[in-house]
Every structure is written in C-alpha cells, then in structure tokens.
C-alpha cells in the first residue's frame, strides 16, 4: 500500500512542498530565509491575534490599551515586544532574501520574483499600519506625513487623502480602518506567499552557481528540514535576546508619549526598516518627485530581470558585479543612516548622492558591467 502521505489530497501538497521536494544539493544558508520568513509570518499572526484580543482601536483608549497589555495582561509585555521586534526580524529576513535573489540571479524566475515584489509592498503596508496602532506621537505623525504624500497625486490627491483619513485629519476613523487593514493584510500575505511558493515549485530552486541542477537533486527532508530548523533556532535566539534584553532598542522613544495633534516631534521618522526609502523620498525637493522615487525604490526590482545582460545567471563567478553588489549594500546602509538624521547639511547632500547611486547601480552600472564581463570571457 502506498504511503498516505503521497496519496491523500491534503498531505500530498505538504509532501510535494516540504518532504519529497527535489532540491539542489548545493544551496547555501542564503536559501534559509524563505522558511524563516514563513516562521516570522506565523509568529506575527499569532502574537498579533493575542494583542488584538486586548487592544482597542479608539483614539481615546488605544494608547492606554497598549499600556494595559504590557502591565496587566498575563505575559502581555512579552507578546507585545515579540510582535514589535518580530517585525524587525521579518524585515531583516526580507532584505537578506531579496539580496540573495539579486546576487544569485533568482530574479530569472519572473512569476516568483514579481509576486515577491508584491509581497514586499504588502508587508511594508502592513508594518506601516501596525506602527500607527499604539497611537503614540510617532504613530500619529508618521501616519500624518506618509498618508499626506498621496496629496501629491495630481487632480485626485487631496480627495484621496481625505478619503483614506475618513475626515480632514488623521483621527478616530483613520485608526479604526488601519486596525482593520492591519488585521486582514497578514492573511493576504499568507495567500500570496503560498502562490509565491507554488510558482517557485514549478521551476525548482535556483542554486549558488546559477547552473541548472536537474541532474543533482536531493530530497528536501531530512537534509533541508534540519538545516531550516537550525536557522529557526538562530532566529528565535536573536529575537528573544532582543525582546528580553533590549526590547526598545529599535523603537522610537517618542512613541511612549501619547499622540498629540498640537505638538509636532522635532524629528519625524519611520521604523528603521523604512529609513532607506524615507531617505530617498526626502532627497528630492519636489513632493510628487519624492513620492515617485519612494515607490520606484522598490519597484525598480521589477526592472532588474529585464536588464540582465550577463551570459551567466549568478554573480558567483563575476567579481566586478560582486563589487557593485556590495557597493549597493553599502549604499543602502548609508541611506538607512541618512533617513534617521535631521534634514540639514551635510546629510541632505549625502542622501541625494546615495539616492542617485542606488538607482545608477541597479539601472546603469550593473547591466554595463555584465556586458564588460561577457567580453572579458570572450563571449
């Protein structure tokens, strides 16, 4: 009798995705982040669910309900901090996952890559709306500044902003709808992640060499299940060190002050994982231009497969492209630093240069370098 694992309609899906999946024998630890993102998503949904049981999405009680969770609910403090720092771990894994895709040419799977970009946008939207919920100073002013950017859209901008706000400013209606969206979006992310995986399994995984590996596949279980468990343990360790020793390390002290529409904080800035995009937004003096640059900073990833001029898929054997890739990483770190600095000299100029360099590397230098490398190999 054939194993039920391979015949039952439900277990068959799990079997073909996580057990008998043919996997390249040489994928490195950089391929761990997909499973880690799945774990992060499950963790965020579970902790978020327990937080939602005690949270109230009303401007008068939102801030005190979060304080109540931390002070009075059994283990509420650890659930709250696991959720807040879990978001940071989520984005660390996301950035490393996208970076892996860029380095090893995983973007040559167009469906998987494009759904990945949609996932990135959706997760960013979810995180932004989640940051508004505690209704601290940075929550309120962050929501005001970012939603206000939509007013830069010609003709319909102002109406659009007021429609999103549910009034003439960020208020009770805004908070309630942000809570509703923040609750539903992770489930949409889960569905998109399933589609992401579906398309990946149509082609099979890429590998560090970028060479087709059909002739050398091994089963996912036990080889990569055990490898993923190691990754999960390291992720859990990092998260719990953060939660138990310095839970507010990545947060903003201003968010411990209740939201006050009459008092603007001296420096309005988003969470650390949005700072690179925020720096690109601020480096353009024109409002509409800034908004376009902000969207394009992520959307530029969709153009990367079209600009792949190399005869090789991966950067493993392309030292010049490797140098450019690490220059891009350094540039993104610079942008992240600039995003957290006040808008004054020399930070403005550094931010503008870093923003120009970001788009130049991805759109101009990488395709040209790939052509140069092809010629060096006499191809």
Swiss-Prot record:
Cofactor note: Binds 2 heme b groups non-covalently.
Binding-site residues, a ubiquinone: 201
Residue numbers binding heme b b566: 97, 196
Spans traversing the lipid bilayer: 33-53, 77-98, 113-133, 178-198, 226-246, 288-308, 320-340, 347-367
UniProt KW keywords: Electron transport, Heme, Iron, Membrane, Metal-binding, Mitochondrion, Mitochondrion inner membrane, Respiratory chain, Transmembrane, Transmembrane helix, Transport, Ubiquinone
Binding of heme b b562, residues: 83, 182
Stretches of the chain forming a coiled coil according to its record: none
Cellular component annotations (GO), alphabetically ordered: mitochondrial inner membrane; respiratory chain complex III
Statement: the UniProt record of this protein carries the keyword Electron transport: yes
Any GO BP: mitochondrial electron transport, ubiquinol to cytochrome c
Cofactor(s) named in the record: heme b
InterPro entries membership: Cyt_b/b6_C, Cyt_b/b6_C_sf, Cyt_b/b6_N, Cytb/b6-like_sf, Cytochrome_b, Cytochrome_b_C_euk/bac, Cytochrome_b_N_euk/bac, Di-haem_cyt_TM
Keyword field contains Metal-binding: yes
GO molecular function, one term: metal ion binding
Note: Heme 1 (or BL or b562) is low-potential and absorbs at about 562 nm, and heme 2 (or BH or b566) is high-potential and absorbs at about 566 nm.
Complex and partners: The cytochrome bc1 complex contains 11 subunits: 3 respiratory subunits (MT-CYB, CYC1 and UQCRFS1), 2 core proteins (UQCRC1 and UQCRC2) and 6 low-molecular weight proteins (UQCRH/QCR6, UQCRB/QCR7, UQCRQ/QCR8, UQCR10/QCR9, UQCR11/QCR10 and a cleavage product of UQCRFS1). This cytochrome bc1 complex then forms a dimer.
Functional description taken from the UniProt entry: Component of the ubiquinol-cytochrome c reductase complex (complex III or cytochrome b-c1 complex) that is part of the mitochondrial respiratory chain. The b-c1 complex mediates electron transfer from ubiquinol to cytochrome c. Contributes to the generation of a proton gradient across the mitochondrial membrane that is then used for ATP synthesis.
Name of this chain's protein: Cytochrome b
Organism: Galictis vittata
Classification lineage: Eukaryota, Metazoa, Chordata, Craniata, Vertebrata
Gene: MT-CYB
């Amino acid at each position: 009798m054939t194993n039920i694992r391979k015949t039952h309609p439900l277990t068959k899906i799990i079997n073909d995705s996580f057990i008998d999946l043919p996997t390249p024998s040489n994928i490195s630890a950089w391929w761990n982040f997909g499973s880690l993102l799945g774990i992060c998503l499950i963790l965020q949904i579970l902790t978020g669910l327990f937080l939602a049981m005690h949270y109230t999405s009303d401007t008068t009680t939102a801030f005190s309900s979060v304080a109540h969770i931390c002070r009075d609910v059994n283990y509420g403090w650890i659930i709250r901090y696991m959720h807040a720092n879990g978001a940071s771990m989520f984005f660390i894994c996301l950035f490393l996952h996208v970076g892996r895709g860029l380095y090893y040419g995983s973007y040559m799977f167009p469906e998987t890559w494009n759904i990945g970009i949609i996932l990135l946008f959706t997760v960013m939207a979810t995180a932004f709306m989640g940051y508004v919920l505690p209704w601290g100073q940075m929550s309120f002013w962050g929501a005001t500044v970012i939603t206000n950017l939509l007013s830069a859209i010609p003709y319909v901008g102002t109406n659009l902003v007021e429609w999103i706000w549910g009034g003439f400013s960020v208020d009770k209606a805004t908070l309630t709808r942000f809570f509703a969206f923040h609750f539903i979006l992770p489930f949409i992310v889960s569905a998109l992640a399933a589609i992401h995986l579906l398309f990946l399994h149509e082609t099979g995984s890429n590998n560090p060499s970028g060479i087709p590996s059909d002739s050398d596949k091994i089963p996912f279980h036990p080889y990569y299940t055990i490898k993923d468990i190691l990754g999960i343990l390291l992720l859990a360790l990092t998260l719990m060190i953060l939660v138990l020793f310095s839970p507010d390390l990545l947060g903003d002290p201003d968010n411990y002050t209740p939201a006050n529409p009459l008092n603007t904080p001296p420096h309005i800035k988003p969470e650390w994982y949005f700072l690179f995009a925020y720096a690109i937004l601020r480096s353009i003096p024109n409002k509409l231009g800034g908004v376009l640059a902000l969207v394009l900073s992520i959307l530029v990833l969709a153009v990367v497969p079209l600009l792949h001029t190399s005869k090789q898929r991966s950067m493993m054997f392309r030292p010049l492209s490797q140098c450019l890739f690490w220059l891009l990483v350094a540039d993104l770190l610079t942008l992240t630093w600039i995003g957290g600095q006040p808008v004054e000299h020399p930070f403005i100029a550094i931010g503008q240069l870093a923003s120009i360099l970001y788009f130049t590397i991805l759109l101009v230098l990488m395709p040209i370098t790939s052509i140069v490398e092809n010629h060096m190999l006499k191809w």
